[in-house]
Design a protein with these regions (language model features):
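Glycine-rich His-Gly loop
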Residues: 10-14, 89, 112
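Active-site signature of alpha/beta-hydrolase-fold catalytic machinery across serine-
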Residues: 23, 97-98
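N-terminal beta-loop-helix "entrance" segment that forms/cooperates
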Residues: 42-62
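Alpha/beta-hydrolase active-site loop
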Residues: 55-78
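Flexible "cap/lid" loop of the alpha/beta hydrolase fold
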Residues: 103-140
């Protein structure tokens, strides 16, 4: 696939800060791309500050997936060209939704959350989601 697009948007998952994309941002900028790494709504702060505030932040706690999707949809539609989007985990699901809606030129989902209705029974997947979903007795901590 050939694309002349020169803008990349990096979308993080739910449990990390957008700062995790720093090395990717540098890499793609050195290759001549314009790189945007917009944080999720209510997550634009240093990691230490987020760790202290998010478990009790009512704005973040009341946010729904539709709000996050709308946030990124507004970003991609405000650009002069359709960007390439790369997302990890829940960010990968957001990428799939943006691709499905025809809002981006290309999308790459890294270790993506699967779309609704698709579930893997592979032990590695089941084990990975049990703790964040609070399905295990020792999984009651916030992330």
């Amino acid at each position: 696939m050939t694309t002349t697009n020169k803008t990349i948007i990096l979308i993080t998952g739910a449990f990390v800060s957008h700062s995790i994309w720093h090395n990717w941002e540098i890499y793609f900028r050195e290759k001549g791309f314009t790189v945007l790494v917009p944080p999720w709504p209510h997550k634009d702060a240093p990691v230490a500050e987020l760790r202290n505030s998010l478990p009790n932040n009512p704005s973040f706690a009341s946010m729904r997936l539709a709000d996050v999707i709308a946030h990124y949809e507004n970003i991609v539609t405000s650009l002069p060209e359709k960007p390439i989007v790369i997302g990890h985990s829940l960010g990968g699901l957001i990428v799939q939704i943006l691709v499905n809606r025809g809002l981006v030129s290309a999308g790459i989902a890294l270790h993506s959350v699967p779309p609704k209705g698709i579930f893997s029974f592979e032990w590695s997947f089941v084990k990975a989601i049990m703790k964040p979903l609070g399905l295990l007795p020792f999984g009651k901590k916030t992330y």
